[in-house]
Curated annotation (Swiss-Prot):
One of its GO terms (cellular component) is plasma membrane. Expressed in taste bud cells of the posterior tongue. Ubiquitously expressed. Residues 172-231, 352-376, 429-465, 535, 596-635 are cytoplasmic. Its main location: membrane. Keywords: Glycoprotein, Ion channel, Ion transport, Membrane, Transmembrane, Transmembrane helix, Transport. Belongs to the TMC family. The chain crosses the membrane at residues 151-171, 232-252, 331-351, 377-397, 408-428, 466-486, 514-534, 536-556, 575-595, 636-656. It comes from Mus musculus (Mouse). Voltage-gated chloride channel involved in high-concentration salt taste sensation. Depolarization induced by high NaCl concentration may trigger the activation of TMC4-mediated chloride influx into taste bud cells, helping the return to resting potential. Also allows permeation of organic anions including gluconate, but their current amplitudes at positive potentials are less than that of chloride. Involved in pH and temperature-dependent modulation of salty taste. This is Voltage-gated chloride channel TMC4.
Length: 694
């Protein structure tokens, strides 16, 4: 009956006003050239189901296809209805077959165990809540500093355990080590008397503690204490390589994980802010404290993105003359930076060379305080330049017109070059003293291969220099905190006027603090061969530093006015650590292979080189073991190994290229999705305006 339906006139008028169908609109999409599916069994865009039975058959096809998948239902990017069908089909299949295969069962159990172990490890990590609180209140950059400090503390703790197990314990298990050597007139390399016997005054004891001389010079702290036993020499040398490999693997793992975040942050995929607004929140947070911390973290991330966007927009709006002016200014500022670095390096070299001359003067030899100052003269110069120049570099970087992340990188590069190069200049000057300037035919080095008159145990001397650097760095940190930062904060709070503004607000300078950590760790890497217990000292130092920095952070510092990306810190900091590890390996390997060991101290005394102990140990092995070890050094082993490595490298490169093409395709699909949405929005506006006019 027409009373219950529509009149023919209304039906005809509706058909006249009807626009293009949904299928025709979808076929006009920019992505219509490529047929897209939303999952297995889902019909293409623009295809309509005929009836409900077709929809049921679609879900059935969905489930049948899903049954072929090996992933769990919760990991599949499908609708909830399809996941339920997938789960039911899997359960039905297991009931029909009796049970799943043993391999699939153990694979699933192993996956669950790995996930639970990972979650458990994250929950028992020390200071996890402290780092989260720091990140929420002071930003991701400050959190990355404390995360790096915790990471280095863990590495030093592992190295300390290895040093004790492979050096100190074998020394005492094979019998008590011999006492210090006495005067030996018949020795062609002179005599070595590490400390004076008898009672000494308290100031002298304090001086020995700070300089590493006296009773500490002949102790397990330094190289010269360990006796010349073949087994001990092997474990002593093997521990160095074992610790280096552990350091390298841990830093590489940390830097690779940070590289992924950096590439994602620097790419064009996350240029919009929608991913932070819609996907940055953690809906599993409980409690107001956690919620506020997460809000602050998101706020800092958005702040960094907005700051860098403003700088990029200003750079894009510059004219050619303005860009030329900026580049000229950058060139002049870089020349100034090079001049400052050159002056610092010359000062460090002069202080190291002049130390021996000052130590021979009667006034210095008779006054313990002057002798202590002269011994610490290179450390004082290094710490002075490291304290003065980083703020200058920060001011120069602010004048160059870079983004905040780029400024952080430049400050880090210049500061790390200053700190590590200053250490290199110190080592070069010490090498010049040990090897008579590289001239082994000189009068002082001809008999023993090193300057035995001035430095009878050169390994212990190197260990003492690194020990003083570590100790002086800790003392400087404590003094600056107690005598500069706390009084400055009190002055700023008590004097709100001009004097308070002059003192300024303290902000945690992440680049300076991070480079201080990397410099201290590089010193430990250089000195751990000559001072075996230096990692243990550095562990205690980092533990004190962590507690001190945490207290001062919440009581003295205020949140930084300008922050930087966490991805920059997570990748760049381990990269600088790798540079420090590479620099520290050079003097250690040079000492092992090229400089003759001291003839009067250490486990390698009497050898042509430290490495000569390894061939002698190999010759004491059975003939089969000798043949195998010598085979590892022949071309019959190295050439196939090189070929296999080349094949694996080519495979890795090809796999990376495939992944790169896949990523490019996914990026193109994302761009197509954006174009589809814009097109649909335009058509919707056009249709609504057409209906409104009609």
């Amino acid at each position: 009956m027409e009373a219950w339906g529509q009149s023919p006139a209304c039906s005809s008028s509706r058909k006249a006003r009807t626009g293009p169908s949904l299928a025709s609109v979808l076929n006009d999409l920019p992505s219509a050239a490529t047929l897209r599916y939303r999952g297995p069994g889902v019909l293409p865009w623009g295809t309509l189901d005929e009836d409900d039975d077709e929809g049921g058959r679609s879900l059935q096809a969905f489930a049948e296809t899903a049954q072929m998948e090996s992933h769990p239902s919760r990991e599949l990017p499908w609708p909830m209805q399809a996941r339920r069908a997938h789960r039911k089909s899997q359960a039905t299949g297991q009931l029909a077959s009796g049970s799943e295969s043993r391999a699939a069962y153990w694979t699933r159990q192993l996956s669950r165990t790995k996930g639970k172990m990972k979650e458990g490890f994250q929950t028992i990590q020390p200071w996890a809540w402290t780092l989260k609180k720091i990140g929420g209140q002071f930003g991701a950059g400050t959190e990355s500093y404390f995360s790096l400090l915790r990471f280095l503390l863990f590495l030093n703790l592992v190295a300390s355990v290895i040093e004790i197990c492979m050096k100190l314990i074998p020394t005492w298990l094979e019998g008590a080590p011999p006492g210090p050597p006495g005067p030996n007139i018949s020795s062609p390399c002179g005599s070595y008397i590490p400390h004076t016997h008898g009672l000494v005054a308290f100031p002298t004891q304090l001086f020995n503690l700070l300089s590493g001389e006296g009773y500490l010079e002949w102790s397990p702290l330094f190289y010269g204490f360990y006796p010349p036993r073949s087994n001990l020499a092997i474990t002593y040398l093997c521990s160095v390589f074992a610790i280096s490999v552990i350091y390298l693997l841990c830093i590489l793992r940390r830097s690779v994980s940070g590289l992924k975040e950096t590439l994602l942050a620097e790419s064009d995929i996350l240029t919009s802010y929608s991913h932070r607004v819609f996907s940055a929140w953690n809906f599993g947070l409980c409690g107001d404290v956690h919620v506020r911390l997460r809000q602050r973290i998101i706020l800092y991330e958005l702040q960094v993105d907005l700051e860098e966007a403003v700088v990029r927009r200003r750079a894009a709006e510059q004219t050619l003359s303005q860009r030329a002016k900026v580049w000229s200014m950058r060139a002049l500022l870089n020349v100034l930076v090079l001049a400052l670095l050159g002056a610092a390096f010359y000062g460090i070299y002069w202080a190291t060379e002049y130390t021996l001359t000052l130590q021979e003067t009667p006034l210095v030899r008779q006054t313990p305080l002057f002798k202590l100052l002269v011994d610490y003269l290179p450390s004082i110069f290094i710490s002075l330049f490291n304290f003065v120049l980083p703020p200058v570099f920060k001011f120069i970087a602010s004048l160059e017109g870079y983004t905040q992340s780029r400024q952080i990188v430049l400050i880090l590069l210049r500061t790390v070059f200053l700190r590590l190069a200053s250490l290199v200049f110190l080592l070069v000057s010490l090498w010049s003293q040990i090897t008579c300037g590289g001239n082994m035919e000189a009068e002082g080095c001809k008999a023993c291969g090193y300057n035995y008159k001035e430095i009878p145990c050169w390994e212990t001397r190197l260990g003492q220099e690194m020990y003083k650097l570590v100790l002086f760095d800790l003392l400087m940190g404590l003094l600056v905190t107690l005598l500069v930062q706390f009084p400055r904060k009190i002055l700023c709070g008590l004097c709100p006027g001009a004097l308070g503004r002059l003192s300024g607000t303290l902000e945690f300078q992440v680049p300076d603090e991070v480079l201080g950590l990397i410099y201290a760790q590089t010193v430990v890497w250089v000195g751990s061969f000559f001072c075996p217990l230096l990692p243990l000292i550095n562990t205690a130092k980092f533990l004190i530093l962590f507690c001190l920095k945490k207290i001062t952070l919440f009581s003295i510092y205020s949140p930084a006015s300008r922050t930087f990306r966490a991805s920059t810190a997570n990748f760049f900091f381990p990269l600088v650590l790798l540079v420090g590890l590479a620099i520290s390996a050079v003097p250690v390997l040079y000492s092992i292979f090229l400089i003759p060991p001291s003839k009067l101290c250490g486990p390698f005394r009497g050898k042509l080189s430290i490495w000569a102990q390894i061939p002698e140990a190999i010759e004491s092995l059975p003939q089969t073991a000798q043949n195998f070890l010598y085979f590892l050094g022949t071309q019959a082993f190295t050439v196939p190994l090189l070929i296999l490595s080349s094949i694996l490298m080519m495979y890795t490169v090809a796999l990376a290229n495939c992944y790169g093409r896949l990523i490019s395709e996914l990026k193109r699909q994302i761009e197509t999705e954006v174009q589809n949405k814009v097109f649909l929005a335009q058509r919707a506006v056009a249709l609504s305006s057409r209906n409104g006019t009609s």
